[in-house]
């Protein structure tokens, strides 16, 4: 069932094509855009081409490897290339130490395979809201910097009356009155 309130751009990176298909079917009802990659090798170029809010990143890509180091490596690459993107790590070989390493390295959350659909959706939507909030904070900080750099930008108008008023305010502001 399609939802009217779908928001956010999600990128899923996993080497298992069956998982990618299942996740795309599940999450397309909840996110505006769901893109999949079956290898992290194109991750950085994909992020340069399109702005994603959240990346769901598998932690193991090579056959026989299950220690999570590949995911941690790609997490670091992603944090450096696109610090605004929130990352949720995703693995079948989870333990507390690996989850802690991932969170310390900058992941927003950690999900274990096999996943519970409701929990996965809730996690990804929560992380999307975090991403949106952080972008809004950054936008507001930039506006604040602009106002601080150019105090005149706080005033509307360039008429003679407004210029006179600005001069009066600046004169009074320098006094103890």
Q: Which sequence ranges carry the predicted segments?
A:
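Non-catalytic signal-transmission and effector/linker regions of two-component phosphorelay proteins
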Residues: 1-11, 17, 24, 41
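Two-component/phosphorelay signaling modules centered on CheY-like receiver
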Residues: 17-35
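Short hydrophobic/Thr-rich beta-strand motif most characteristic of the beta2 strand and flanking loop
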Residues: 31-40, 46, 66-67
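Short amphipathic alpha-helix used as the core "switch/output" element in two-component signaling
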Residues: 60, 64-83
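Conserved ASCE P-loop NTPase core motifs with emphasis on AAA+ ATPases
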Residues: 65, 96-97, 118-156
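AAA+ ATPase active-site-proximal loops
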Residues: 145-177
């Amino acid at each position: 069932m399609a939802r009217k309130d779908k928001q956010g751009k999600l990128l899923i990176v996993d080497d298992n094509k069956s998982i990618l298909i299942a996740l795309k079917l599940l999450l397309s009802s909840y996110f505006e855009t769901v893109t999949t990659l079956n290898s992290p090798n194109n991750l950085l170029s994909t992020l340069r081409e399109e702005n994603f809010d959240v990346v769901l990143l598998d932690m193991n890509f090579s056959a026989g490897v299950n220690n999570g180091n590949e995911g941690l490596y790609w997490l670091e690459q992603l944090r450096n290339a696109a610090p605004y993107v929130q990352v949720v790590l995703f693995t079948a070989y989870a333990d507390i130490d690996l989850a802690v390493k991932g969170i310390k390295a900058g992941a927003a959350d950690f999900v274990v395979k096999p996943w519970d659909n409701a929990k996965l959706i809730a996690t990804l939507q929560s992380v999307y809201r975090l991403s949106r909030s952080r972008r809004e904070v950054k936008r507001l900080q930039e506006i604040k910097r602009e106002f601080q750099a150019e105090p005149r930008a706080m005033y509307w108008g360039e008429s003679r009356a407004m210029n006179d008023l600005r001069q009066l305010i600046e004169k009074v502001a320098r006094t103890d009155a």
